[in-house]
Amino acid sequence: MNVFSLPISELAERIRNSQLTSIELCEYYISQIDKFEKDVKAWAYFDKKLLLEKATEADTYRKSGKPMGLLHGIPVALKDIIGTYDMPTECGTVLRKGKTQSQNSEIVDLLKS
């Protein structure tokens, strides 16, 4: 299945209806990043392991039957100016190389809810 051209609403619906898992979606995106990143250089930081861990958590949570947010299980890319506790927030400068935040910014928490 080529999910690249599907709108986010369709991806979310397929995840809710168990036609697609977060792991499958993330594996697809990882394959595309692996294929094109050396030429595009779009990522300041990319952690495949963390992405797949979060996808596994999302799929497990979905199976529990508990209420989910509309974007549950959909991976979201953030600019490195958005504060996160589990990824570097370097703001595009070597002065902040490897710096992380003690907590997520409000927008990150909203996206995760």
Positions of predicted regions on the chain:
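Gly/Ser-rich catalytic/binding loops embedded in alpha/beta enzyme cores
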Residues: 2-113
